Design a protein with these regions (language model features):
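Extended serine/threonine-enriched, polar tracts that run as long, contiguous segments within proteins
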Residues: 164, 169-182
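Residues that line or immediately flank small-molecule/substrate-binding pockets and catalytic motifs
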Residues: 8, 154, 176
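Extracytoplasmic
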Residues: 145-147, 167-169, 193-195
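Short consensus segments that form the blades of beta-propeller domains
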Residues: 161-163, 185-188
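Short secondary-structure subsegments characteristic of cysteine-rich extracellular domains
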Residues: 188-206
Length: 281
């Protein structure tokens, strides 16, 4: 009686993680892509349409925090153990880091305004800490399981040619603890820090190749590029473009998390209402 539910659980995992399993004649062929599959997957992300500046009737840039503790955001967090997962399925953090290491993502920045680039060595300083302890050394690394969220920068704009409100993701940054505090129980630092920033259009090719588990149809995985462009995540607005130097909500509403959330909802609602207001005479 207990074998059937277990079989139903294992089957989707096998179907997703082991390509060509139905056509394989020997074990070595399991997981290898067929020529037809390679040809079908040899595509790129859907190109953005050209937007004329004169067609943008209104726009606003916002910074949002995506909390990976929320269930809807879990596809960006998992998998954290890749020993039994196909090579094209990685967490968003591992995908970005692999793209940086291999040179697919050439430009990495220290902030969301792209004012200064950082090198691979500077990224390692934020991800790896070697602590000397007498004759021994302990190495601490920020891994996928240490990433607690993402900061995303995007623009909402009203396209007067199409007559609708649209969103374009501009940049994103993984958020984690300070690597210097890892392994130090005496230091309580719950602050999350931006590890690095990437310009989203430059990451689309590699995010398109990396797949996300699709619980509704395991034979048709979704790419990170599709997921992000569709805004399949829950977020809280942290900052908006404003006259006060783009200050954060926490800078003018201090010490009250509830009021900060209410202010974030107010900003989100004002953006949503902008499309309706455009059609009012």
């Amino acid at each position: 009686m207990n074998r059937l539910p277990l079989f139903l659980f294992v089957l989707p995992f096998i179907a997703f993680s082991q390509a060509n399993i139905l056509n394989a004649t020997k074990v070595d062929e399991i997981g290898k892509q067929t020529d037809a599959r390679i040809a079908a997957d040899n595509d790129g992300p859907l190109a953005y349409g050209y937007i004329d500046e004169r067609d943008i009737l209104w726009s606003k840039v916002v910074w949002e925090f995506v909390d990976l503790n929320q269930k809807i955001n879990l596809p960006y967090y998992f998998p954290i153990d890749t020993s039994n997962i196909s090579s094209d399925r990685r967490s968003l953090f591992d995908t970005l880091l692999r793209g940086i290491r291999k040179g697919s993502i050439k430009n990495v920045y220290s902030d969301s305004f792209f004012t200064s680039k950082i090198t691979g060595a500077e990224i390692d300083e934020k991800l790896v800490n070697v602590r000397l302890n007498g004759d021994y050394s302990d190495t601490f690394r920020i891994k996928t399981q240490d990433i607690e969220g993402y900061m995303m920068k995007g623009m909402w704009y009203f396209d007067k040619r199409l007559g609708e409100l649209k969103y374009r993701l501009l940049a994103l940054a993984p958020m984690g603890k300070d690597v210097l505090t890892l392994g130090l129980p005496d230091i309580e630092d719950e602050e999350l820090y931006e590890l690095f920033w990437v310009f989203y259009p430059e990451t689309r090719d590699i995010l398109h190749k990396s797949k996300v588990f699709n619980p509704k149809n395991v034979s048709q995985p979704i790419s990170y590029d599709h997921l992000l462009n569709a805004r399949r995540f829950n977020s809280v607005i942290i900052r908006e473009e404003n006259v006060y130097g783009n200050r954060k909500i926490a800078d003018y509403i201090r010490g009250n998390a509830l009021f900060q959330l209410l202010e974030a909802d107010r900003i989100k609602e004002s953006i949503r209402n902008k499309e309706i207001d455009m059609w009012n005479y």
